Regions:
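Aliphatic-rich helix starts adjacent to a transmembrane/signal segment
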Residues: 2-71
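Short linear sequence signals and composition-biased patches located at protein termini or domain-edge surfaces
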Residues: 3, 142-190
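Residue-level signal for beta-strand positions within conserved beta-sheet cores that form or flank
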Residues: 14, 102, 174
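Short, cationic motifs built from Arg/Lys/His that form the positively charged side of catalytic pockets
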Residues: 60, 71, 105, 117-118, ...
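Surface-exposed patches in mature extracellular/periplasmic domains of secreted proteins
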Residues: 78-80
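Type IV pilin-like appendage domain
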Residues: 82-153
Length: 190
């Protein structure tokens, strides 16, 4: 009687069938792939924003230092090209309590793709290898076509045009004409 009873009992409906397990696995995989895609997209976008921000900050630093130096410089402001490298030299006032004049220079190296800057109380010696010890303002700098990075604007200023690489996105462009606001002349040369 006991053996007969176990044979007649209905099979248990507990647990999952193989098809239910396959469907659940496929749904879980689909959700996981979607979430992974969103995370990868967000990471890529964040990386792009970071490189553009870094390039923008470097270019703005170059423009700020040029503007601060050249807008108060005594004329003449000298813009020179040596091969594909270019540099600006200007006689600038000190920021101290008494007015003294010093020299500032900005150097674009096409080989290193950098813009560097230095200041001195006396004249500045310009050489392609010597400028590597100067303060680095920006790297990844390129000319815009055949337009020089630094070009003279008479004897009282400079036209500055360049791009800064921003990783895999479009380079960030900068262009400005900076002229001296100082009436000072004849305060020596650099």
């Amino acid at each position: 009687m006991l053996a007969e009873r176990t044979r007649n009992e209905a099979p248990s409906d507990e647990g999952f069938t193989l098809i239910e397990m396959i469907v659940a696995t496929l749904l879980f995989s689909l959700v996981t792939i979607t979430i992974a895609g969103v995370i990868i997209s967000a990471t890529t976008a964040e990386r792009s924003v970071r490189t553009v921000t870094s390039a923008t900050s470097a270019g703005q630093l170059v423009m700020r230092t040029l503007d601060a130096g050249l807008s108060s410089a005594a004329s003449p402001i000298t813009v020179t090209a040596t091969g594909s490298d270019q540099y600006i030299v200007a006689r600038v006032p000190s920021r101290g309590a008494t007015l003294t004049w010093g020299c500032s220079a900005w150097y674009f190296s096409s080989a290193d793709r950098t813009i560097r800057q230095t200041t001195s109380s006396s004249s500045i010696s310009i050489s392609a290898s010597g400028q590597r010890s100067w303060t680095l303002l920006a790297d990844g700098v390129r000319q815009v076509g055949t337009t020089p990075v630094f070009a003279a604007s008479g004897t009282i200023g400079a036209v500055v045009t360049f791009t800064v690489d921003a990783g895999t996105t479009k380079p960030v462009s900068f262009a400005s004409t900076i002229t001296t606001q100082s009436p000072a002349t004849g305060v020596g040369t650099c």
